Regions:
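Metal-dependent phosphoester-hydrolase catalytic domains
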Residues: 110, 114-117, 130, 147, ...
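Active-site beta-strand/loop signature of hydrolases that rely on acidic residues for catalysis
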Residues: 2-7, 37-62, 136-139, 155-183, ...
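Short, solvent-exposed loop/turn segments at secondary-structure junctions
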Residues: 8-11, 56-58, 86-87, 108-111, ...
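Conserved hydrophobic/aromatic beta-strand scaffold that supports enzyme active sites
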Residues: 5, 102-104, 126-128, 138, ...
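N-terminal, active-site-proximal structural segment of metallo-dependent hydrolase catalytic domains
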Residues: 1-74, 81-89
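Short, flexible loop segments at the rims of nucleotide/cofactor-binding pockets, characterized by
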Residues: 25-31, 115-117, 142-147
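Structured beta-strand-rich core segments of catalytic domains in phosphoester-bond hydrolases
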Residues: 54-133, 225-227
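Short aromatic-enriched loop/helix-cap "lid" or pocket-rim segments at secondary-structure transitions
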Residues: 13-19, 64-65, 91-94, 126, ...
Length: 227
């Protein structure tokens, strides 16, 4: 199985864009050509499963285009997605923000998906995807250290209930890299696929290891790459 994890930043591109005055709200103006480039890149990776972060699922910024469904359609994949904010968050009803989501794309052998929510932070969504031989959790953790620690505790509880081998992937916003993840990984019995601690952020000149693919017992890693 080939897993691709990609924060597409609502397909606004890497240039400077005006930002909404709400933490984590993303960007206001779209860039029509960027989504096509993202689709071509994702297709070139030939993934079996894709975890997408910061996806626009149909706001005015994307011209009403559901980016998760557009990418899934190009791959012939199933898609599941949900707004990344808490169920009672005001962001769930605000224009643009309510269309900001995370998503899984996968071939049609999905057994089920579940949406969980952290108790703290602005970005609270955890997507759980169950396949034949593995359970994958997709996360985007808080920018605040204290909130991240509470979120990691909650994530440990979700992982510990899984009855299949586990993968936990996403943008952890860990400004101290794997050192910040050490206790969570030990408690959950997880290891990083990024054994060389290759940085992933910012994309043009990566300096920080913010993104992780963690795996548990019963899973063998045959390759890892940060494009």
């Amino acid at each position: 199985m080939r897993l691709l994890v990609y924060n597409i930043r609502y397909a606004v591109g890497a240039g400077m864009s005006p930002q909404l005055p709400v933490p984590g709200a993303g960007y206001l103006f779209g860039n029509p050509g960027t989504l096509d480039n993202i689709i071509e890149f994702v297709k070139s990776c030939r993934p079996d499963v894709v975890g997408l972060l910061e996806v626009d699922v149909g706001s005015v910024r994307s011209g009403g285009v559901n980016q998760a469904e557009a990418i899934a359609g190009s791959l012939g994949h199933f898609s599941c997605y949900e707004c990344k904010y808490g169920e009672e968050s005001l962001n769930q009803v605000l224009p643009i923000l309510r269309k900001q989501a995370n998503a899984f794309l996968a071939a049609p052998h999905i057994l089920g998906e579940r949406f969980h929510y952290f108790d703290t932070g602005i970005k609270r969504l955890v997507i759980e995807l169950e396949l034949d031989g593995v359970v994958i959790f997709l996360v985007h953790l808080s920018l605040k250290y204290r909130h991240r620690q509470f979120q990691l505790r909650h994530l440990y509880e979700l992982v510990s209930r899984a009855r299949k081998p586990v993968i936990v992937a996403g943008d952890f916003n860990t400004f101290w890299g794997e050192n910040e993840m050490f206790l969570f990984m030990k408690a959950a019995g997880l290891r990083s696929a990024n054994t060389g601690r290759v940085p992933s952020y910012p994309s043009r000149i990566p300096r920080l290891e913010l993104d992780f693919i963690l795996y548990g017992a019963g899973i063998e890693i045959t390759g890892f790459d940060v494009p």
